[in-house]
Regions:
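Terminal low-complexity tails and localization/encapsulation signals of metabolic enzymes
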Residues: 1-32, 65, 69, 118-143, ...
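ALDH superfamily catalytic-core signature
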Residues: 218, 226-364
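Residue-level signal for inorganic ion chemistry
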Residues: 10, 27, 63, 85, ...
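Glycine-rich loop-to-alpha-helix module at the N-terminal edge of alpha/beta enzyme cores
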Residues: 30-118
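Short linear capping/connector segments at secondary-structure termini
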Residues: 84-92, 122-128, 313-319
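Rossmann-like NAD(P) dinucleotide-binding subdomain of oxidoreductase/dehydrogenase enzymes
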Residues: 120-262
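Short alpha-helical
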Residues: 39, 76, 80, 91, ...
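Structural signal for hydrophobic packing residues in well-ordered secondary-structure cores
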Residues: 52, 56, 71-78, 82, ...
C-alpha cells in the first residue's frame, strides 16, 4: 500500500477518515487517502494565509528559483511519476511518460521562464509615465481532475506561486498519487511552509470548503460542466477571481481531399488518447458523403486493431478507464446509442484479458 497524506504547513498529516484508491486496471486497492473535512481545509487555508506575506514579499527572481528547484527534483523522479500515473489512472505508461511526466516538469520550467517578462509594464505619455504593477491575488484554491493529474496540478500551482500567491490545492480523489509525490518534492527542496498545501478528499466536502472559504481569493477549477456551474454559483457572489476549464464536445471534419492513410491514425489518436478521457479529444467524426464508405471501412479497421491491455506494457495502445463507475457510464451511452438506432461498427464491449486485468475497468475503443 502506498502512503498518501495531506501536506499542510510543511508537514504531512493524516485525517480521521480515509478513501480507498483503486487501481482501475486490476481492481486492487493501492492506497487509503485522506478524506479531508472542513476543519482539515481550514488548517490548510490558515497555513497559506500565514505564509502569504513573506512569500509575496520575495522578488520574482527569488520565487523563480524555487520553481526551477521543483522542476529539477521532479525530473529526477520522472519514471516514478509515469509509473504512479499509470497505476492510478489506468493509462498506458508510454503515454504517462510522454505527456504526464514530461509536461508536469515542463510546466514549472515554462512559468519560471515566462515570469521573467511579467512584472511591470510602463506606458509613456506626453506629461506622465504610467506604470502597471502586478500584485499577488492572495490564496489560490486549485481543484484538479483525474485525467491528467500532475500535468494539470502543476499547470495551476506553478503560475500561482511564481506570481507570489500561496496555494490550497485539492487533486481528484480518484488519482491522488502524483499529487502526493509533488508534496514530497516540495518538502524535499525546502519550499517555505504554507506556500503550497495539498488536501485530499471529496469534491462536495473538501472542494466545496475551498471554494466557499472567505479567505480564498481565487478559484481555478478543471472538471465537469455541472460541477463547474456549482463552483461558479458559490464563487461569483463572493467576487472571487474564477477560472473554469470544463467539458468539451469536439468534432473532426473529414473532407473529400483527405489523405486517408495519414489522417486516420491521427484522428484515432485524437479520439482515443487517454482512453478518450480528455476534454480536447474528438468525440465525433463528420465525413463527406463522397468518401463515407471508404473512410469508414479504413477507420473502423484501424480502431479495431488498437491494442487494449496491460497499462505497464509499451505494446498497449489503450489502458483501463479511470474507474468502474466511469466505465459503467460510458457503456450506458453506448447502449443509449443502440436504442436510438445507432450501429456499433466496432468495440462497445469489454475485452477478454488475462489475470489480473480481467478484473479491470477496460473497454474496447468504440
Amino acid at each position: 500500500m502506498i502512503t498518501v497524506q495531506n501536506y499542510v504547513n510543511g508537514t504531512f498529516v493524516s485525517t480521521k477518515e480515509t478513501i480507498e484508491d483503486i487501481n482501475p486496471a486490476t481492481g486492487e486497492i493501492i492506497a487509503n487517502i485522506p478524506r479531508s473535512k472542513s476543519d482539515d481545509v481550514e488548517k490548510a487555508v490558515l497555513a497559506a494565509d500565514n505564509a502569504r506575506e513573506y512569500w509575496s514579499s520575495l522578488s520574482l527572481d527569488d520565487r523563480r528559483v524555487w520553481l526551477e528547484k521543483i522542476a529539477n527534483a521532479l525530473e529526477a523522479r520522472s519514471e516514478e511519476i509515469a509509473t504512479l500515473e499509470s497505476l492510478d489512472t489506468g493509462k498506458p505508461i508510454k503515454l504517462a511518460r510522454a505527456v504526464d511526466a514530461s509536461r508536469s516538469i515542463a510546466n514549472f520550467r515554462f512559468f519560471a521562464e515566462f515570469s521573467k517578462d511579467y512584472n511591470k509594464e510602463r506606458f509613456e505619455m506626453d506629461d506622465a509615465t504610467n506604470h502597471v504593477i502586478f500584485k499577488p491575488v492572495g490564496i489560490a484554491g486549485l481543484i484538479t481532475p483525474w485525467n491528467l493529474p500532475l500535468y494539470l496540478l502543476s499547470w495551476k500551482i506553478a503560475p500561482a506561486i511564481v506570481m507570489g500567491n500561496t496555494v490550497v490545492a485539492k487533486p481528484s480523489e480518484l488519482t491522488p498519487l502524483t499529487a502526493n509525490l509533488l508534496a514530497e518534492v516540495i518538502h524535499e527542496v525546502g519550499l517555505p511552509a504554507g506556500v503550497v498545501n495539498i488536501v485530499h478528499g471529496l469534491g462536495y466536502e473538501a472542494g466545496q470548503t475551498i471554494v466557499s472559504h472567505p479567505k480564498v481569493n481565487l478559484i481555478s477549477f478543471t472538471g465537469g460542466t455541472i460541477t463547474g456551474k456549482k463552483v461558479a454559483e458559490t464563487a461569483a457572489p463572493m467576487f472571487k477571481k474564477l477560472s473554469l476549464e470544463l467539458g468539451g464536445k469536439n468534432s473532426t471534419i473529414v473532407l473529400d481531399d483527405v489523405k486517408m492513410d495519414d489522417a486516420i491514425p491521427e484522428i484515432a489518436r485524437s479520439g482515443f488518447l487517454n482512453q478518450g478521457q480528455v476534454c480536447l479529444c474528438g468525440s465525433r467524426v463528420l465525413i463527406s458523403h463522397k468518401i463515407w464508405d471508404e473512410f469508414t471501412e479504413k477507420f473502423v479497421n484501424y480502431v479495431d486493431n488498437m491494442k487494449v491491455g496491460d497499462p505497464s506494457s509499451d505494446n498497449s495502445d489503450l489502458g483501463a478507464l479511470v474507474s468502474f463507475a466511469h466505465r459503467d457510464k460510458v457503456e450506458s451511452y453506448i447502449h443509449l446509442a443502440e436504442r436510438e438506432g445507432g450501429e456499433i461498427l466496432c468495440g462497445g464491449k469489454r475485452p477478454s484479458l488475462e489475470s489480473p486485468f480481467d478484473k479491470g475497468a477496460f473497454l474496447k475503443p468504440t
